[in-house]
Amino acid sequence: MSNRTALLGKKLGMSQVWDENGFFVPVTLVDVSTNVVTAVKSEESDGYKAVQLGYGQVDPTKVTKPLAGHFAKAGVTPRRHLAEVRTDNAEEFEPGQELTAELFPEGTLVDVTGTTKGKGFAGTIKRWGFKSYRRTHGSHKNERRPGSVGACATPSRILKGKRMAGRMGHVTNTALNLTIVSSDVENGVLAIKGAIPGPKGSIVLVRSAVKGA
């Protein structure tokens, strides 16, 4: 574990900017305003060090009493989304502290975690990239079938992990080592180079890169 900083945000969409060499660079815009520390975990009280973040406003009348007490203890208004990030420097934060895009200046490498777009039930060709059968003589209604899924008597079952048709997407995914192209502290917007998981309006967690240089 290292001194990792993080912000919760909402994916606004994609755009493009010019770089210093005159090339278009695709960027994803993420709104990271209204981030606040709602709790700080320590080894003495919790057995590990971590910081809990809150993001987004929510109607106070729609918050459960336990959560309302949790937010009141931190001295903040109720937040819609919460996330916990383990870090060695958790003692440097305090409940109620507001966090801004200033945490990630231009050029910083970050990891972005989000939920991918859900595609619904999909076959093996779309889900796993299987090759289709040839559409020619002797092949009858087999074009998109998965083929054999295992032996008959031995092991007399389908092995766990077999790639088959099923629900595709809507899973947690992390894009590693993305570069912060610009950090707009005033408006609370980060421009991150490349694409990040999830559709527009989805909630993402931006953390300092764990494998970055």
Curated annotation (Swiss-Prot):
Function: One of the primary rRNA binding proteins, it binds directly near the 3'-end of the 23S rRNA, where it nucleates assembly of the 50S subunit.
PROSITE patterns (UniProt xref): RIBOSOMAL_L3
NCBIfam families per the UniProt record, alphabetical: L3_bact (TIGR03625)
GO cellular component: cytosolic large ribosomal subunit
Gene3D superfamilies for this protein: 3.30.160.810, Translation factors
This protein's encoding gene: rplC
InterPro entries: Ribosomal_uL3 (IPR000597), Ribosomal_uL3_bac/org-type (IPR019927), Ribosomal_uL3_CS (IPR019926), Transl_B-barrel_sf (IPR009000)
Protein name (database record): Large ribosomal subunit protein uL3
Family membership noted in the UniProt record: Belongs to the universal ribosomal protein uL3 family.
GO molecular function: rRNA binding; structural constituent of ribosome
Organism: Bifidobacterium adolescentis (strain ATCC 15703 / DSM 20083 / NCTC 11814 / E194a)
HAMAP family the record matches: Ribosomal_uL3_B
Assembly with partners or alone: Part of the 50S ribosomal subunit. Forms a cluster with proteins L14 and L19.
Keywords, alphabetical: Ribonucleoprotein, Ribosomal protein, RNA-binding, rRNA-binding
Keyword RNA-binding: yes
GO terms for biological process, alphabetical: translation
